[in-house]
């Protein structure tokens, strides 16, 4: 660095310092810095094969802590940075040789103010700071708070400033409530050697990194920038499997990890201190990543024209597209490899381009198991992009200084008429409902006639863009389009009471003008996928095909059907169920103690073809959505559902199991059939009729907490959909059948428990919703006038375990469907746990010692424990090659028992149907069946090849399923589950909470004044945890924490008494204010020491550390 001087233009500071001290100045020479190595002599080597770390890094670390203790700022690297606090105990465990009075620099200097004549400028500055101590004051960061827009234009961040978010918002990962085997995690499990892109969603920064493995449930990565990262909630949009194939290339970096503890807060502090492997340790990995990155950049530069304007070359309509499909439009075919399509470097060129420059209109939704080409995007319609540009121009013209005079504004300002229309609608709404900052309007206070305002086309365009911003969540936090909606709200002049004009205010604006219902659910819009249109009055809009009567083909299985008229079929379901797609019957054999159990499933695929409009609509829906108040059927045609719901004389596809009294599966078969007599009965009435059955299911109490607002519907409004049989109406034979079925189902359940099945599902909050007393009126302009308010009731319920007949016999049918297809090599959507086989012993130990005892005791395992379990399982997925499902205690599994409600079940039925027809033809000709192999869960083989599948007439080949069907199916199943079971349910709960807490609805005192709050983790800007009220997530932000405690003093495991400070329904967020500590969590240093001492011991979880990468586990820790 140079500085100006009065005697010469520029003078080096170091030369000037030496000149003033009388030193001889030599050109082009520097005095080398000498670092003392004695203070690092005690640093342990983690493995004999790993060289010592360079001293420079840890010398800097020691200097940071010395400066912290003295309250000094002696390092330019501290500017704008808050030094993380870390306890002495933890430092000792890190083996950092930090002595209490480390002041070697001051001790080496004279104790007088006289300065030595032999100091460099750096030494002189250090001495000056030592003689003039001042407390360190961090420069405030301009980082935005969570959920707030980010200034990503004038405040840029480089890839070297990347920080990985570790907030785990996936409630389904943290709790065990069901066995639907749908993984809500967007990112598949990564393993050591995989290449990933680490990303910051806030700043749109992406950095390539190699996964080092998972240790104590936390993933570790080494980035191309030479930095080490650890993450407990890793998310990536781009993964290349087996990028590093030789484990020896990873070992130097793994051996240099400073810690592999399971406490994320400690690892975060170490990352901030730049601890971890150096560039020398990771030189080999960096070289390989740079080669990959440079190849990708060369491909990008060679195809710059098409990549710079991707939407110009893609289809105009909104759709889901895989990265491989997008690359087909944007890259030349000559880049393709013969059998695998585009290479990963070419795919990364496309991915990195659209993620960096077009992330507003390309939203990655997850990656499958078929490599980067299976990454799937929600691609916006070209008309949406044009509307955003049009509204942006309108808003800019409205605020442009050259249009300030009235005449010009009247002629050119197209936004002002829209604002006048909106103000009238807002003022009319506020005469009936109070506006609130809680992401929803208040309840109805008076009823007025609906407004008849006429909305212009410009107004509809502006409203559409605000809908994209506030309802559909199209724009990321760092998007340049975030300002548009805020500018429109500011111009309205009606939201002065809002702290920030953000998307939440935009959401309430849409409610006030009648575009959305006051009780609308945000997740219905943010989770909507292409092909489905949300009906703003509730549910989904029907497609044009659905508005026409459905056409059904002839029954292709009619010649194969067998009659089951001699057996009574028991359809066990709720009285208000409309799709009756399963039932069971019993058949005795000629051997005592052995029975045939027949599970009869509705058979719509016999008359619905895979390429029909009904099938295509079912593929878009994926499954029936049971979101309260917005039930949307996969097959919406009532006539079709009635045609195939089980009833006397109806067709069925029957999955039969021969069982003994011990629950052992002796034989199985699949038969097209017709059912005879049917008894409809509820699970509760079955339990009443047969009495208690010992299925080994532990008893658990259900909390009696209830939150209720609105007027409940009358009993007449919930009439059953069919004649239900009561226990006293059952015949003697019916009771005997149900007793045997219950006994066999209980035996099956015990077998599954022995194989590792989850023993019990704990109660979870559920919401009931009724619009009986609310009124929705459509205005002539297509808007909504809503009066009164819906009824919402929140209470605890159990999603599984109602009766063994329901759960275990349906599970057996699914197992038979999977087994039957596997024996014939038929590709179907098998449900899989990718790592369960290789981690079986560790899974058994971990579940039996850690997870299941807590469930049996009525306690949900912690986030860290459930994350470790998921790492061992490898998550849930669908694939054409099966694995066994450990947590269900089954060796092979698919879903086949709800074809009227799930598209994956239709896929299974179509494949089985084609195989049955082919097998029937072969047997008629005297040939053998299609069975080609026996089942062995430890040596599972892939399905038949595509040519053989085509010869058999299968509608779907394995490659078609893996590359075309499964990527879409994964995303749509995940969104459907998230909407109905997580985000949508939580919004209904928060709506009821706001109406009771903020507006005083419902019974007095049903919302406590104070709650017990347990801290789960401490983030950079808040504390996150759960309150003891429906187990809801809540956070303590810095404003509410001020005056109570420093953020650095909060610990995971702290128990506090808190009060509600804010509830935001739109953001699904609760903020609480701490009142007092009830109990302190374990100190970080002591917790870390216990974990380090416990590694390798079964009782402390050491046996479960990095089981999936055992060969790569650091030694000697």
From Swiss-Prot:
What SUPFAM superfamilies does the entry give?
Nucleic acid-binding proteins (SSF50249)
Q: GO annotations under biological process?
A: mRNA catabolic process; mRNA processing
Q: Where does this protein have compositionally biased stretches of type Basic and acidic residues? A: 719-730
Renumbered to this chain, region (Disordered) spans 705-730
Gene Ontology MF annotations: 3'-5'-RNA exonuclease activity; RNA binding
Residues in RNB domain copies: 561-916
Where primarily located? mitochondrion
- Record's GO cellular component terms: mitochondrion; P-body
Supply the alphabetized keyword list: Mitochondrion, mRNA processing
What's a Pfam family this protein contains? SH3_CYT4
What this chain does, per the entry, is described as: Required for RNA 5'- and 3'-end processing and splicing. May act on the RNA processing enzymes directly, or it may act on other regulatory molecules, which influence the activity or synthesis of these enzymes.
Assembly with partners or alone: Homodimer.
Tell me what this protein is called: Mitochondrial protein cyt-4
Organism for this UniProt entry: Neurospora crassa (strain ATCC 24698 / 74-OR23-1A / CBS 708.71 / DSM 1257 / FGSC 987)
């Amino acid at each position: 660095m140079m500085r100006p001087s009065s005697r010469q233009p520029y003078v080096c500071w170091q030369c000037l310092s030496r000149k003033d001290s009388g030193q001889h100045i030599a050109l082009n020479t520097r005095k080398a810095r000498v670092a003392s190595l004695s203070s690092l002599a005690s640093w342990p080597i983690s493995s004999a094969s790993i060289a010592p770390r360079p001293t420079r890094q840890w010398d800097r670390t020691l200097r940071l802590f010395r400066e912290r203790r003295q309250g000094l700022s002696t390092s330019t690297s501290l500017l704008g940075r808050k030094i993380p606090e870390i306890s002495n105990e933890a430092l000792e465990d890190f083996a950092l040789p930090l002595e209490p009075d480390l002041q070697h620099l001051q001790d080496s200097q004279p104790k007088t103010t006289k300065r030595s004549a032999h100091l460099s400028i750096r030494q002189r500055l250090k001495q000056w700071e030592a003689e003039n101590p001042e407390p360190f004051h961090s420069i405030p960061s301009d980082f935005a708070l969570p959920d707030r827009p980010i200034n990503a234009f004038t405040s840029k961040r480089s890839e070297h400033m990347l920080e990985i978010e570790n907030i785990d918002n996936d409630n389904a990962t943290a709790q065990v409530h069901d066995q639907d085997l749908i993984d809500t995690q967007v990112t598949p499990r990564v393993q050591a050697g995989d290449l990933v892109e680490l990303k910051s969603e806030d700043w749109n920064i992406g950095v390539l990194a190699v996964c080092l493995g998972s240790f104590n449930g936390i993933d570790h990565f080494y980035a191309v920038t030479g930095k080490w990262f650890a993450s407990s909630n890793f998310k990536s949009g781009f993964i290349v499997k087996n990028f590093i194939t030789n484990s020896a290339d990873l070992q130097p970096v793994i051996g240099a990890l400073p810690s592999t503890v399971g406490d994320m807060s400690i690892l975060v502090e170490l990352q901030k201190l730049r601890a971890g492997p150096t560039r020398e340790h990771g030189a080999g990995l960096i070289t390989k990543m740079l080669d990959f990155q440079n190849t990708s950049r060369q491909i990008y530069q060679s195809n710059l024209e098409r990549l710079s304007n991707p939407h110009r070359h893609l289809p105009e309509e909104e759709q889901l597209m895989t990265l491989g499909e997008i690359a087909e439009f944007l890259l030349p075919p000559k880049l393709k490899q013969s059998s695998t399509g585009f290479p990963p470097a070419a795919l990364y060129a496309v991915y990195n381009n659209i993620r960096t420059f077009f992330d507003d209109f390309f939203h990655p939704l997850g990656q499958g198991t078929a490599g980067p080409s299976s990454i799937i995007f929600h691609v916006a319609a070209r008309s949406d992009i044009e509307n955003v540009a049009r509204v942006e121009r309108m808003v800019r013209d409205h605020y442009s200084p050259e249009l300030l005079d009235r005449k010009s504004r009247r002629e050119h300002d197209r936004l002002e008429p829209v604002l006048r229309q909106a103000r009238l609608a807002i003022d009319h709404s506020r005469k009936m409902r109070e506006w609130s900052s809680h992401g929803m309007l208040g309840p109805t206070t008076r009823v007025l006639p609906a407004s008849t305002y006429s909305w212009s086309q410009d107004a509809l365009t502006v409203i559409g863009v605000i809908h994209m911003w506030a309802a559909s969540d199209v724009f990321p936090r760092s998007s340049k389009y975030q300002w548009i909606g805020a500018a429109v709200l500011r111009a309205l002049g009606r939201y002065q009471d809002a702290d920030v004009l953000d998307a939440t205010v935009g959401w309430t604006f849409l409610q006030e003008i009648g575009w959305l219902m006051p009780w609308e659910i945000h997740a219905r819009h943010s989770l909507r996928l292409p092909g489905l249109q949300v009906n703003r009055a509730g549910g989904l809009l029907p497609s044009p095909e659905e508005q026409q009567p459905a056409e059904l083909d002839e029954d292709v299985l009619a010649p194969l059907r067998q009659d089951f008229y001699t057996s009574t079929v028991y359809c066990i379901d709720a009285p208000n169920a409309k799709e009756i797609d399963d039932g069971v019957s019993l058949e005795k054999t000629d051997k005592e103690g052995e029975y045939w159990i027949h599970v009869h499933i509705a058979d719509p695929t016999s008359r619905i073809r895979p390429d029909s409009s009904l099938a295509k609509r079912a593929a878009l829906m994926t499954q029936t959505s049971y979101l309260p108040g917005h039930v949307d059927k996969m097959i919406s045609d009532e006539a079709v559902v009635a045609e195939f719901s089980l009833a006397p004389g109806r067709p069925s596809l029957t999955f039969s199991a021969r069982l003994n009294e011990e629950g052992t599966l002796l034989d199985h078969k699949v038969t097209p059939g017709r059912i005879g007599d049917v008894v409809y009965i509820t699970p509760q009435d079955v339990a009443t009729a047969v009495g208690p059955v010992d299925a080994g299911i532990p008893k658990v109490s259900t909390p009696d907490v209830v939150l209720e607002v609105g007027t409940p519907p009358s009993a007449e409004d919930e009439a059953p959909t069919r004649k239900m049989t009561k226990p006293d109406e059952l015949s003697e034979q019916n009771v005997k059948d149900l007793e045997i079925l219950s006994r066999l189902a209980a035996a099956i359940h015990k077998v599954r428990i022995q194989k590792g099945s989850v023993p019990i599902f704990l109660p979870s909050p559920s919401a009931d919703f009724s619009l009986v007393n609310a009124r929705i009126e459509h205005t002539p302009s297509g808007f909504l006038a809503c009066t009164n308010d819906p009824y919402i009731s929140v209470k605890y319920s159990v999603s599984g375990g109602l009766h063994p007949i329901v759960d275990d016999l349906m599970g057996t049918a699914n197992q038979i469907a999977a087994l039957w297809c596997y024996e014939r090599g038929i590709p179907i959507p098998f449900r899989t746990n990718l790592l369960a086989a290789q981690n079986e012993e560790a899974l058994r130990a971990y579940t039996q010692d850690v997870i299941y005892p807590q469930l049996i005791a009525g306690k949900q395992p912690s986030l860290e424990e459930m994350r470790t379990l998921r790492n061992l399982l490898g998550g849930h997925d669908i694939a054409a090659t099966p694995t066994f499902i450990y947590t269900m205690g089954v060796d092979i599994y698919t879903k086949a028992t709800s074809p009227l409600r799930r598209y994956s079940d239709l896929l299974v039925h179509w494949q089985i149907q084609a195989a049955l027809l082919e097998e029937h033809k072969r047997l008629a000709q005297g040939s053998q069946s299609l069975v080609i192999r026996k089942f062995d869960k430890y040596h599972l083989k892939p399905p038949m090849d595509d040519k053989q599948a085509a010869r058999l007439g299968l509608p779907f080949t394995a490659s078609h399923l893996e590359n075309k069907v499964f990527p879409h199916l994964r995303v749509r199943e995940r969104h459907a589950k998230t909407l109905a079971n997580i985000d949508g349910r939580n919004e209904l709960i928060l709506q009821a909470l706001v109406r009771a807490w903020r507006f005083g609805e419902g019974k007095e005192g049903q919302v406590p004044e104070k709650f017990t709050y347990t801290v789960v983790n401490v983030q950079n800007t808040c504390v996150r945890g759960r309150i003891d009220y429906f187990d809801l997530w809540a956070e303590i932000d810095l404003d509410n924490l001020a005056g109570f405690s420093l953020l650095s003093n909060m610990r995971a495991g702290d128990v506090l008494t808190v009060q509600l400070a804010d509830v935001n329904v739109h953001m699904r967020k609760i903020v609480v204010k701490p009142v007092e500590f009830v109990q302190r969590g374990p100190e970080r240093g002591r917790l870390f020491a216990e974990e380090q001492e416990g590694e390798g011991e079964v009782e402390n979880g050491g046996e479960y550390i990095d089981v999936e990468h055992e060969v790569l586990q650091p030694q000697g820790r």
